[in-house]
């Protein structure tokens, strides 16, 4: 009873999370958005099932289909049947394809496994499902999954796939098998290579009218033998003897969710002969095949891999001004998980880049992780019906603006504070953008070094700064006073690399002010253009004023 109560609570929590992300649309807009996406998915379905081609990645299709279902539930529409092919000339399956229920996480899988025994894990091979019917030892019929009850006659196509045994003996002589036709791969590593649109490629080969030699690039993984031997070990042995060797190789006994997780992680990183999108856990004990119905399999579940790329809704477009004055565009997202990382923002780049992407709030974008786990945009996969894009700020900033605070300088000023606090500059540990905003909002800094005047009491009474952290910050600010002269010059934004600045051997503000353009041009990695920038920088009125202020604070190198 406790187990079922836990499952019920999990379901309710899942439903709550779905409702929590329902769009704030009027009924009219909801109808328009749902209708547009429904039409697009129907077009993709027609291309997939009638033409054997795919205009969209498998993962994007799956996620947009799930998004459509979510919207339909939010606004009381009838959810569509996913991947429903046309049934013209359909053939009845001897045994229905049940499909497989997906587990949301390891905890849900653990609850499901707790009620069952004699469990086995298999890879969830990514291809197209098929029924193989053997009569009197020969392949009699091959049927596509279709809607689970009826499918297309694929006998001629399957008979040309060399990986599918055309004759069998013993218990398999009169049998019905269910499995996955897949694209054969050599050393496919799912973690690195992803799905490669394998499902669509297989469907394309199976739907073509010509009997191409390319069918030999396909294989089959049998995952069910309805009314077969009771013992899983016997099933696997007979299948392997008949030529279905992959089933025995990739079926393992498991006792709990931890063991499943280990196998799942192993197959995620291992070289496999097929593309996978997760694992399937099944009980050896199955009901008689006459009781099998689509959507009603209680003896098996799937635990899919998290997609390498996720479809995320754009909630807002925001503009940021960097320390150099360049305007960058950031998309605020409905949260998605990527490799155990919660992603809520992604950098689009420059205003021009944003305009080229043509991204607006309400659009659906494909997001993945680039090097060092940084989110990136891979594609815009769906644009909303109503698209209102914000106006970017005027491009009035440059590398010599906003050393002093003003209303128009807010963003660049904060960016300068974040920069000077970085490890490679003044090394102010424990404060980031949010902390700087809190300090500036409360104490209204005059310029980028005004924080040097804050007292312990002021820091302690700053909203947004924990009292336990205020003493640490005051200590960090005091330590900064002892940083080398070159660090302070870097904090002021001198347009030189750290290596060039160190090579200059400048150790005082007065010495730096009297250095010529020719002197700077001789430094490593510093050409004439960069040297002119240094001259413009040191002659700027704001820079001179900051230098004088630091001298008054007796910062090393700035004293008269």
From Swiss-Prot:
Record lineage: Bacteria, Pseudomonadati, Pseudomonadota, Gammaproteobacteria, Enterobacterales
Family statement drawn from the similarity comment of this UniProt entry: Belongs to the NAD-dependent DNA ligase family. LigB subfamily.
HAMAP family: DNA_ligase_B
Record-given protein name: DNA ligase B
E.C. number(s) listed in UniProt: 6.5.1.2
Primary gene name: ligB
Top-rank lineage group of the source organism: Bacteria
GO molecular function, one term: DNA ligase (NAD+) activity
Reactions it catalyzes: NAD(+) + (deoxyribonucleotide)n-3'-hydroxyl + 5'-phospho-(deoxyribonucleotide)m = (deoxyribonucleotide)n+m + AMP + beta-nicotinamide D-nucleotide
Keywords (A to Z) from UniProt: DNA damage, DNA repair, DNA replication, Ligase, NAD
Chain coiled-coil ranges: none
Active site: 124 (n6-amp-lysine intermediate)
One GO term of the biological process aspect: DNA replication
Function field: Catalyzes the formation of phosphodiester linkages between 5'-phosphoryl and 3'-hydroxyl groups in double-stranded DNA using NAD as a coenzyme and as the energy source for the reaction.
């Amino acid at each position: 009873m406790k187990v079922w109560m836990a499952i019920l609570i999990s379901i309710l929590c899942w439903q709550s999370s779905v409702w929590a992300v329902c769009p704030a649309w009027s009924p009219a807009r909801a109808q328009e958005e749902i209708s547009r996406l429904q039409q697009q998915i129907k077009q993709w379905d027609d291309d997939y099932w009638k033409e054997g081609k795919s205009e969209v990645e498998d993962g994007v299709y799956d996620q947009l289909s799930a998004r459509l279902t979510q919207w339909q539930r939010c606004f009381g529409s009838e959810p569509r049947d996913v991947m429903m092919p046309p049934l013209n000339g359909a053939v009845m399956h001897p045994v229905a394809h049940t499909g497989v229920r997906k587990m949301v996480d390891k905890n849900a899988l653990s609850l499901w496994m707790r009620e069952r025994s004699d469990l086995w894990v298999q890879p969830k091979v990514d291809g197209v499902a098929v029924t193989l019917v053997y009569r009197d030892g020969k392949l009699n019929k091959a049927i596509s999954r279709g809607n689970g009850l009826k499918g297309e006659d694929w006998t001629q196509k399957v008979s040309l796939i060399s990986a599918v045994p055309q004759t069998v003996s013993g218990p398999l002589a009169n049998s019905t098998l269910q499995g996955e036709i897949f694209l054969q791969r050599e050393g496919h590593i799912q973690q690195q290579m992803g799905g490669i649109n394998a499902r669509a490629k297989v469907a394309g080969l199976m739907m073509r009218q010509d009997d191409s030699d390319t069918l030999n690039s396909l294989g089959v993984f049998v995952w069910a033998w309805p009314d077969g031997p009771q013992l899983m070990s016997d099933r696997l042995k007979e299948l392997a003897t008949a030529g279905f060797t992959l089933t025995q190789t990739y079926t393992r006994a498991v006792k709990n969710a931890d063991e499943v997780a280990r196998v799942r992680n192993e197959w995620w990183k291992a070289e496999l002969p097929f593309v996978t999108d997760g694992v399937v856990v099944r009980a050896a004990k199955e009901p008689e095949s006459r009781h099998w119905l689509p959507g009603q399999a209680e003896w098996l579940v799937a635990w899919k891999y998290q997609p390498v790329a996720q479809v995320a809704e754009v909630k807002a477009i925001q503009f940021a001004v960097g320390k150099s004055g360049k305007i960058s565009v950031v998309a605020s997202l409905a949260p998605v998980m990527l490799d155990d990382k919660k992603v809520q923002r992604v950098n689009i780049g420059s205003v021009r880049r944003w305009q080229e992407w043509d991204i607006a709030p309400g659009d659906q974008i494909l997001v993945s992780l680039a090097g060092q786990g940084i989110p990136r945009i891979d594609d815009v996969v769906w644009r909303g019906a109503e698209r209102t894009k914000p106006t970017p700020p005027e491009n009035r900033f440059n590398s010599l603006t906003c050393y002093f605070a003003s209303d128009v300088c807010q963003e660049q000023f904060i960016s300068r504070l974040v920069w000077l606090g970085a490890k490679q500059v003044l090394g102010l540990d424990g404060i980031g953008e949010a902390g700087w905003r809190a300090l500036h909002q409360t104490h209204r800094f005059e310029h980028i070094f005004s924080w040097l005047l804050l007292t312990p009491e002021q820091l302690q009474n700053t909203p947004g700064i924990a009292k336990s952290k205020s003493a640490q910050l005051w200590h960090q600010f005091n330590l900064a006073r002892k940083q080398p002269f070159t660090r302070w010059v870097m904090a002021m934004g001198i347009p030189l690399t750290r290596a060039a600045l160190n090579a200059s051997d400048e150790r005082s503000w007065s010495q730096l002010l009297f250095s010529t353009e020719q002197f700077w041009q001789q430094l490593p990695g510093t050409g004439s253009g960069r040297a002119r920038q240094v001259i413009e920088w040191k002659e700027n009125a704001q820079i001179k004023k900051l230098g004088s202020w630091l001298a008054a604070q007796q910062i090393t190198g700035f004293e008269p």
